[in-house]
Amino acid sequence: MTTIDLNCDLGESFGAYKMGNDDEILPFVSSINVACGFHAGDPSVMRQTVEKAMQHNVAIGAHPGFPDLIGFGRRNMNVSASEVYDYVLYQIGALDTFVKAAGGKMHHVKPHGALYNMAATNPEIADAIAKAIYHSNPSLLFYGLANSEAFIQAAEKYNITLVQEAFADRTYKQDGTLTSRTEENALIKNEEEAIKQVLQMVKEGYVNSVNGEKVAVQAQTICLHGDGEKAVQFARRIYRTFENNEISICTPK
């Protein structure tokens, strides 16, 4: 049977501001990426998200981003590799403490937003993230964009496990990178199209680029976004689609 991990970014609320549909999404995913206070989240939200994830037996990962609350971590920053290392190590440590306090064990690290996209094409940034993971806990898995040579080489250098990721509702360019959110066609808003894309990636190993060309994708995890209007409905449909197609949802080891 084909197996796949379903991951989602959660814990993005901050103070009085509520983001996402965390409680409703949790039953349909196998792993989550928790914001660590830089681009979103706060200490109380981090603790609550960890505790809820453990109740659902969902794997918990850190979701470190740039220190950019206003831009939600989606704006590129002109920072050095050394600064990226510090940012990521700091955020991993913060979440790991909450996980340990709840009696759990952290599973993975997935960079967020602009940090993720920069690392996918910038070997120095990817290296800094991988080094921070290695120095924090080399058994942590590294979630990164499928086919990214920068991610692959960084994981190999530090002998950490890379879990290659694809996206359910994002479009792809010919080189296998994600279409920038600044472009109109970055998101797939039609549920049927998104489900078709996911099945192509999981069962057939490819995705159609925005130019209509087939791009090989060997994904081990699929990211669902939990903050859209129909996010819960979409998560439920993906979950049932996998069941109907004999695709087992499970956490990567």
UniProtKB/Swiss-Prot annotation:
Enzyme Commission designation: 3.5.2.9
Enzyme class: hydrolase
Xref: Pfam families: LamB_YcsF (PF03746)
Keyword ATP-binding attached: yes
InterPro entries: Glyco_hydro/deAcase_b/a-brl, LamB/YcsF/PxpA-like
GO BP terms, alphabetized: carbohydrate metabolic process
Catalytic reaction annotation: 5-oxo-L-proline + ATP + 2 H2O = L-glutamate + ADP + phosphate + H(+)
Keywords from the UniProt entry: ATP-binding, Hydrolase, Nucleotide-binding
Job description of the protein: Catalyzes the cleavage of 5-oxoproline to form L-glutamate coupled to the hydrolysis of ATP to ADP and inorganic phosphate.
Quaternary structure and partners: Forms a complex composed of PxpA, PxpB and PxpC.
Stated family: Belongs to the LamB/PxpA family.
Protein name from the UniProt record: 5-oxoprolinase subunit A
